[in-house]
A protein has these predicted regions:
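Bacterial Sec-dependent N-terminal signal peptides
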Residues: 1-38
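Conserved positions within compact, well-structured domain cores
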Residues: 36-236
Length: 236
């Protein structure tokens, strides 16, 4: 009886330790799952269904392709403009913008045999963006549909005022990540626009998607390949 009385609290302590260890493991992996991407390219969220498509709900924020091949950082205007190999950059060269807005990438990252998106995901094609446009507002006119506000975060923290039409009803969570212009302009447009790459070339240009702070449209049309845009990955 004495042995049983001693063993009972010890057994309870053992069970509590196992439970604590299990909770720590769950918390660790939950935190991992809320991160975006591991260098090896495994998806760890977040993503969501918009119409028939599954989109990642944050701008891409990686420094490697999904096989671990590094992507160089550009740290100056000249370095960005001179870089014909894959590169990423902080908007306004300011690392504090990274957490909210993600990174901007050059065309060499997109136009590459390696995939910068997680395994089973890819940089959207023009057709992918067109499907999203159709879901939001029907057939585009002059490359635009009304309904882009359904993609934009509400308020004026990540967008300039008035942030027209923003409802974020799709949970796409678009922020005003801006862009890096080609040539010597190095315009950022932080909080006033959000530009996203597609993989689809048209002539000497490439299709890209754009949202603005002062209208409710989603534009998907041709633009230059010398800029730096954000990436939103979509499921294969």
């Amino acid at each position: 009886m004495t042995v049983l009385l001693i063993m009972q609290p010890l057994f309870k302590i053992f069970k509590m330790k196992k439970l604590a260890s299990l909770i720590i493991s769950i918390l660790f992996f939950s935190n991992l799952l809320m991160s975006q991407v591991m260098p090896q390219g495994f998806l760890i969220g977040p993503d969501g269904l918009i119409g028939t498509q599954r989109w990642m709900l944050k701008n891409l924020d990686v420094t490697t392709f999904n096989d671990g091949t590094p992507i160089a950082q550009a740290t100056t205007n000249a370095g960005w403009n001179a870089n014909s190999s894959p590169a990423w950059i902080y908007n306004n060269l300011d690392a504090t913008n990274n957490q909210v807005y993600g990174k901007l990438y050059n065309w060499a990252v997109i136009n590459n045999s390696l995939n910068v998106c997680p395994v089973q995901y890819h940089v959207p094609t023009y057709s992918d963006w067109l499907v999203l446009q159709n879901f939001l507002g029907g057939t585009p006119s002059n490359y635009m549909v009304t309904g882009g506000g359904k993609l934009k975060q509400t308020g004026i923290v990540t967008w300039d005022t008035p942030n027209t039409g923003a409802t974020n009803s799709t949970k796409f969570n678009a922020v005003g990540n801006g862009y890096i212009g080609g040539g010597n302009s190095f315009s950022s447009s932080l909080k006033s626009s959000a530009l996203f790459w597609s993989k689809t070339v048209t002539g000497s240009n490439v299709y890209y998607a754009k949202l603005n702070y002062n209208d409710d449209n989603l534009y998907v049309g041709p633009g230059i390949t010398t800029g730096g845009f954000a990436i939103r990955c979509i499921h294969d």
